[in-house]
């Protein structure tokens, strides 16, 4: 559509996935949403939280990614190598922990944080669309003990129009998501380098 740059449009699927993921949580204004991973999808989900008047808390071990999240307006970020994640979330939420947690397996964050940061009876959404993930391990005893609701969202089906509308209205800021642009003629030369990069 007119008014949307190509470099923004390539994130339509991730925006649609984030919209669908937050919709699956049945949040209310002011709820806290812990997001495990400050990758592109995690930051987009956090931006949407702010738009929906939720309070995102982004958790990642990569300071560069956390800085990018902060540049996108995310106020609460936690680096587990620098702070006790559970204690910090207790401070942020006034002792009640996060009502909701989003976990994106490609973020390289461990799922074992989920029970310690999500309040009893809270909801966890495992989100993403990478079908080549290794097995994920989460202690179901902890999930049962806290009576957590677990759901999964693997695509943004049904939310593309919403995603396009959010881009057109500049709700989502994609600045910093693209490291470099490669010209078509340079693909053969650049492919070995970019195939080694982790995203």
Q: Where is each model-derived feature located?
A:
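Phosphate-coordination loops involved in phosphoryl transfer and adenosine-cofactor binding
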Residues: 29-32, 98, 121
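Mid-domain Rossmann-like dinucleotide-binding core that forms the NAD(H)/NADP(H) cofactor-binding site
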Residues: 5-82
């Amino acid at each position: 559509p007119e008014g949307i740059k190509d470099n923004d449009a390539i994130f339509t699927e991730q925006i649609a996935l984030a919209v669908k993921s937050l919709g699956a949580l049945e949040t209310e204004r002011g709820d806290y949403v812990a997001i495990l991973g400050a990758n592109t999808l995690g930051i987009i989900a956090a931006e949407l939280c702010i738009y929906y008047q939720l309070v995102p808390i982004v958790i990642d071990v990569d300071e560069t990614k956390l800085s990018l999240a902060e540049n996108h307006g995310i106020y609460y970020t936690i680096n587990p190598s620098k702070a006790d994640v559970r204690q910090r979330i207790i401070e942020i939420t006034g002792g009640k922990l996060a009502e909701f947690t989003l976990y994106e397996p490609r973020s390289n964050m461990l799922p074992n944080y989920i029970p310690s940061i999500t309040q009893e009876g809270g909801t966890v959404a495992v989100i993403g669309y990478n079908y080549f993930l290794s097995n994920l391990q989460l202690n179901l005893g902890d999930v049962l003990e806290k009576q957590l609701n677990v759901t999964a969202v693997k695509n943004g089906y049904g939310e593309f129009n919403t995603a396009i509308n959010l881009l057109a209205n500049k709700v989502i800021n994609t600045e910093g998501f693209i490291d470099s642009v490669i010209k078509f003629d340079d693909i053969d030369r650049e492919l070995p380098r970019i195939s080694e990069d982790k995203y």
